[in-house]
Amino acid sequence: MFNQSFLKYMLFGFFLFSFHAHADRIRDLITIQGIRYNQLIGYGLVVGLDGTGDRTNQISYTTHALKNMLFQLGITFPNEQNAKFKNIAAVMVTTKFPNFTHIGQQVDVIVSSVGDATSLQGGTLLMTPLRGTDNKIYAVAQGNIIINDKNSVERFKNILVNNHLNNGMIINGATIEREMHTDFGKNETLNLQLNNEDFTVAQEISKKINMQYPKSAVALNSKIIQVCIPNNNIEQVEMLATIQNINIPIPIQDAKILINAKTGNIITNQTININTCAITHKNISMTIAFNKLKINRLVPNPIIKSDKNNNKTLNDEQIYKNNYNTNNFQYLEKTSNLNTIICALNLFDITTTELISILQSMHDAGCFHAKLEIT
């Protein structure tokens, strides 16, 4: 039921944001164009598995990769057709290459099985070159793989732990062998990219930068602020450090509700006020008026009867006519925001699909003023 997985399927942030404007540092609002992560990838072998590796008689590329590796070590490989191993697995190795990383530094890598291995638990990744989009080798990975422990759920029964046995990590598993080329510091201008496009914020950032460095910044659009920078690399670093720590007053953000239809997660960026409305969805009826909420859910296949006083009964149980004591009826005072309404709906064990349908209907009817995005 929905209420049994309320925390799993719904997130209303950690706290609902207020409507008051606040100040953020520029560094929290932008990224610097050209400073980013670069992706590296490589193909390798994991050995030392306890009978959970690829079935080499069916996965030919695992045996072929092992043959090539042993050949480079000067070892003659036996007939591939008769070779059967259970302790090796073919894997793809990926990592993110940060900017300004130098030779000898180490980064974490992700190891994922590409064959039919059942688990990478206890395996060791053999030396694997990691290449960029230009096919050049930038790092070499090797080490013991760490995956989720099967006993994690038993030790932490109140925490949901997923055991992805065919996917693991090697902490500091790759060593940088080549530095990535970057154009940072070679141009006379630098673009600051807003994480969320906003003309007001872009103009405010440009204004604040110009107060510190006159006539150096201009907002090109709602996303890009172009800054003129000195040619000297040391002066560039000093200037950017100063700019990143400038405080910017953030205007009131547009109210937004984001719904993930697959997971059921619902996130809002502020308190959403609700207008007067009445909604009927399947066997659920809801009325909101004068900051009061009434919700009723009928049982399947109800038998409704009316007496001479027009009192309605459901399966011989009175539920209407000023009776708020039954389990199928909720009456709440002073409810004017979306959070309260969802909590009330949760009491009726509604499904995620029903909740999304109700919110969509309320939005279409103008019951609340916020951007609704369903992904």
UniProtKB/Swiss-Prot annotation:
Predominant cellular place of this UniProt entry's protein: other
GO molecular function, one term: structural molecule activity
Compartments reported by the entry: Bacterial flagellum basal body
Signal peptide: 1-23
InterPro entries, A to Z: Flag_FlgI (IPR001782)
GO terms (BP aspect): bacterial-type flagellum-dependent cell motility
Keywords assigned: Bacterial flagellum, Signal
GO CC terms in record: bacterial-type flagellum basal body, distal rod, P ring; outer membrane-bounded periplasmic space
Source organism, top-level taxon: Bacteria
Transmembrane segments: none
Record Pfam families: FlgI
PANTHER family, A to Z: FLAGELLAR P-RING PERIPLASMIC PROTEIN FLGI, FLAGELLAR P-RING PROTEIN
Oligomer status and interactors: The basal body constitutes a major portion of the flagellar organelle and consists of four rings (L,P,S, and M) mounted on a central rod.
Classification via NCBIfam families: PRK05303.1
Protein family (similarity comment): Belongs to the FlgI family.
Function of the protein: Assembles around the rod to form the L-ring and probably protects the motor/basal body from shearing forces during rotation.
Name of this protein: Flagellar P-ring protein
Organism for this UniProt entry: Buchnera aphidicola subsp. Baizongia pistaciae (strain Bp)
